[in-house]
């Protein structure tokens, strides 16, 4: 089960996401569903069907868990290959 405390250790593909803040104002506010993830990027399918590739390190993301909880994550914390990030140890707040 994905919770705000363990979202780093789970797959992000399929989650709803919105770009809350970004260095690039053009992508701020974009929302959709994560369809792919690489070491440095998230590929987001927007509501109109278009896909956009967003660098993780330049944005703050709002993810919605399957239970409906909203989680804010600084993209710099996500920069890693998904399989490495899932194994990585994170300090609990």
Curated annotation (Swiss-Prot):
GO BP annotations listed: tRNA 5'-leader removal
Gene3D superfamilies the record matches: Ribonuclease P/MRP, subunit p29
Keywords assigned: Cytoplasm, Endonuclease, Hydrolase, Nuclease, tRNA processing
Catalytic activity: Endonucleolytic cleavage of RNA, removing 5'-extranucleotides from tRNA precursor
GO CC terms of this entry: cytoplasm; ribonuclease P complex
Molecular-function GO terms, alphabetical: ribonuclease P activity; RNA binding
Induction of expression: Constitutively expressed (at protein level).
KW Electron transport (keyword) present: no
Localisation per UniProt entry: Cytoplasm
InterPro entries cross-referenced by the UniProt entry: RNase_P/MRP_Rpp29_sf, RNP1, Rof/RNase_P-like, Rpp29/RNP1
Statement: the UniProt record of this protein carries the keyword Methyltransferase: no
Top-level enzyme category: hydrolase
SUPFAM superfamilies cross-referenced by the UniProt entry: Rof/RNase P subunit-like
E.C. number(s) listed in UniProt: 3.1.26.5
Quaternary state and interactors: Consists of a catalytic RNA component and at least 4-5 protein subunits.
Task performed by this protein: Part of ribonuclease P, a protein complex that generates mature tRNA molecules by cleaving their 5'-ends.
Family: Belongs to the eukaryotic/archaeal RNase P protein component 1 family.
Protein name (record): Ribonuclease P protein component 1
Organism expressing this protein natively: Methanothermobacter thermautotrophicus (strain ATCC 29096 / DSM 1053 / JCM 10044 / NBRC 100330 / Delta H)
Underlying gene: rnp1
